[in-house]
Amino acid sequence: MLATWRRFFHPSGNDDASSPSSLYNEKCGELEINVTESSPPKATGAVKIEAVEAVGGRKGRYLLYIGLVLVMVIFELDNSTVGTYRNFATSDFKHLSVLATLNTAASIITAVSKPPIAKVSDVLGRAEAYIFTITCYILSYILCASSKTFNIYAGGYVFYSVGQAGTAILNSTVVSDISSMRWRGFVYNILYIPFLITPWVSAFIVDSVVNGIGWRWGIGMFAILMPFCASFIIVTLLVFERRAKRSSLILTEKLNLFTFCSRIDLGGIILLSGGFALVLIPITLAATTSDCWKTPWVVVLIVLGAIALACLYPYEKYFARHPVVPTHYFRTLSVMVSMALACVDNIGFGTTQTYLYVWSMVSHNFSPRNAQFLNYSNSVMQALVGMGTGLLMYRLRSYKWIGVVGAAIRMVGYGVMVRLRKNESSVAELFIVQLIQGAGSGMIETIVIVAAQISVSHAELAQVTSLILLGSFLGNGIGSAIAGAIYSNQLRDRLRLHLGHSADEATVVRLYNSITDTLPTWGTAERNAVNRAVCSPAFVCYLT
């Protein structure tokens, strides 16, 4: 039995590469990819992490994995609690109707922040980039926890989105730095083991916090927890970098402002990030308000964003010395298809998940804890299936057909969702929908990351990873905008229709903007009317 198990994980062929910088001629199915390392500047993050591995050896690698686990634990706990507190914060500020707008803006900011942070990590180093992102986290917690108005809370969420973007891209980059290509799909997903536990733990935390000390304290405690847990990997990286410098493995390089801007490709970052932001944020605002399309500045911003994106390719080809999007990416099918697939998959996710938490509390009378269970069962299943997909990729040395199976499961999930996500559905049926969707996404998300990464050199690892994650978060933002548009344009009229003449306009507005203190008692005629409004086909279509 043991011999059979060993043969499964050690198929014919050598897996002699322990890091991507030493792995060449990696075969995926019938496709052979020849990776040729370029010679990046000596102070790049890729060179620094290679020097850290050389100085630290096996012990250093284990310390980095421990640091990554600590960061992932607090990152996932934050992700599964602070994101939930957003529902209660917008309700307390009487702005529940703009929840989708806030989610979309956060997704867009998260998406467009990834390429510049990836570039900074390449120029300055992984540890220095971690310090920047954790600082953004701390500022966001302070602003959100102490906010007196919705605008201050939203401003804090901007910093939160930047911190989340940076931490996510750095975690993905570091784990790719220290793992081989064949094992990368598995190692990339195994870091999400904490996510198999944190949603269930966070459900009890959220339930206690919102019914006790309040969501502000729930956010504020991360201002201490996040830097404490992140300090391990930051200190580990800095200590080994210092040793590598003493051994002359890293050459100290002083950058002036012009050289720094050239290295991070400031012009390309402005065109890429600014272009997407100028296109998507106005579209989001226009979709979630009734008269926003009539404002001239919306069209102007969209046109400016489109022009910026159109200028990206010629700028990167003819002007950029260190392009944030190397032009050969546009001709690399595995990069472009992976980015498009990640975007499309997350459009579906954002559309069907944005108001799921609120919907379950209203239509099924879920407590905050049970709504949390439902909301994150999809992602937990995604993490589990992602690990299995990574092992399967190691065995088969191929990913194309796994991706096809994942897409098919995703489509089956949408079909099941149309049938089962209703007011009359049982709790088991609601969870079945989430699990099927998560299984499909687990395959797809693993495939797109690895397929893109094995097509580039180690020096471009952070860049290509940031672009795939950019596609993911852009898709999530677009999906949230779709959900928000339907919420804004449908729910108020549906509430008026089902509540009838017994409810005045003030009651309709309160139900539309908040769930924390305005829902009628469960089982009453008024509550049944609200449930029918929320679950009516014209409104719930975004969930299917």
Specify the residue positions occupied by each region the protein language model found.
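Transmembrane core module of solute transporters
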Residues: 67-69, 77, 84-85, 94, ...
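Helix-to-loop junctions at the C-terminal end of transmembrane segments
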Residues: 113-126, 210, 385-401
